[in-house]
């Protein structure tokens, strides 16, 4: 199931606005990531850019630090939601989404290990390098989103 964890605590839609329209109880149920995971639903994250951030690090932070009790997910589930599950949802998991022999080696090198930082510091992790098919793709500081799009478009390469 595709989700957009960027909408959790989305600054353009204050909680009070959503609560006024939906009521507090229903507003809190808009992104029940923990409920989905506990029930075995495979979730993949994405973005409505430019309406929400296209930054997967922000999505992981929002999913792990979900403000509603019981709806936060583990770092492992959040990483899987942003990697393998996305390719599973698009029927491309046999080629991408995990590091295995025979698959494209598309990956990022992060400034810190998401499993070792405090959950509240996940948002501070930076992408240091992007690799497409195992090869470095310029400096990520130049234009990581253009590089990521190029990687997505090279599906059949």
Where are these regions (language model features)?
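His/Asp/Glu-enriched, well-ordered alpha-helical/loop segment
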Residues: 1-116, 120, 125-133
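Glycine- and charge-enriched low-complexity intrinsically disordered segments
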Residues: 137-152
């Amino acid at each position: 199931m595709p989700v957009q964890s960027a909408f959790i605590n989305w600054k353009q839609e204050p909680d009070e606005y959503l609560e006024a329209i939906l009521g507090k109880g229903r507003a809190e149920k808009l992104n029940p990531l923990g409920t989905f995971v506990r029930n075995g639903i495979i979730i993949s994250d994405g973005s409505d850019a430019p309406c929400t951030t296209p930054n997967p690090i922000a999505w992981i932070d929002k999913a792990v630090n979900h403000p509603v009790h019981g709806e936060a997910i583990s770092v492992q589930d959040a990483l899987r939601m942003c990697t393998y599950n996305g390719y599973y949802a698009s029927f491309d998991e046999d080629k991408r989404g995990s590091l295995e022999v025979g698959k494209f080696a598309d990956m990022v090198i992060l400034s810190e290990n998401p499993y070792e930082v405090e959950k509240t510091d996940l948002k501070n992790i930076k992408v240091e390098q992007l690799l497409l098919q195992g090869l470095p793709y310029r400096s990520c500081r130049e234009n990581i989103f253009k590089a990521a799009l190029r990687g997505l478009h090279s599906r059949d390469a």
